[in-house]
Amino acid sequence: MRPIHIAQLDKARPVLILTREVVRPHLTNVTVAPITTTVRGLATEVPVDAVNGLNQPSVVSCDNTQTIPVCDLGRQIGYLLASQEPALAEAIGNAFDLDWVVA
């Protein structure tokens, strides 16, 4: 499960950490996707809510991924569930206009 933390971006906001867990301890920066309550219904959004540790229904915005210093990460507040990983993969593929064939 991918962790959700509070991070200092334009303001303190929840983010989903996208960087692989196995390499995180060795890095000074991580790639994150911000989480927002502004839902646009885009194919690049992944719905998240209380089951993920959030106070209100929100979306992971894969159009706005960014790499930030690890020191900008605050406390962990939740996780993306394993069952939500396929939606995340699809949203990232849409955000970067990737074409792939799933075997």
Swiss-Prot record:
Signal peptide start-end: none
A single BP term in Gene Ontology: negative regulation of translation
Reported induction: Mildly induced (5 to 9-fold) by starvation, when grown in a non-replicating state, in the presence of isoniazid, gentamycin or rifampicin.
The keyword Nuclease appears for this protein: yes
Activity regulation text: Digests 23S rRNA in the absence of Mg(2+), increasing Mg(2+) concentrations decrease its efficiency.
KW Hydrolase (keyword) present: yes
Protein EC: 3.1.-.-
InterPro entries the UniProt entry points to: PemK-like, Plasmid_toxin/cell-grow_inhib
Top-rank taxon, per record: Bacteria
Pfam families: PemK_toxin
Molecular-function annotations in GO: DNA binding; RNA endonuclease activity
Keywords associated with the record: Endonuclease, Hydrolase, Nuclease, Toxin-antitoxin system
Knockout or disruption consequences: Individual deletion of mazF3, mazF6 and mazF9 have little to no phenotype, but a triple mutant shows increased sensitivity to oxidative and antibiotic stress and starvation, decreased formation of persisters cells, and a decreased bacterial load and pathogenic damage in infected guinea pigs.
Quaternary context: Forms a complex with cognate antitoxin MazE3, possibly with 1:1 stoichiometry.
Function: Toxic component of a type II toxin-antitoxin (TA) system. Acts as an mRNA and 23S rRNA interferase, cleaving predominantly after the first 2 Us in the sequence 5'-UUCCU-3'; in 23S rRNA only cleaves once in the ribosomal A site in dissociated but not intact ribosomes. Cleavage of 23S rRNA inhibits protein translation; the 23S rRNA region cleaved is involved in tRNA-binding in the A site, 30S and 50S subunit interaction and ribosome recycling factor association. Upon expression in E.coli and M.smegmatis inhibits cell growth and colony formation.
Family of the protein in this entry: Belongs to the PemK/MazF family.
Name the UniProt record assigns to this protein: Endoribonuclease MazF3
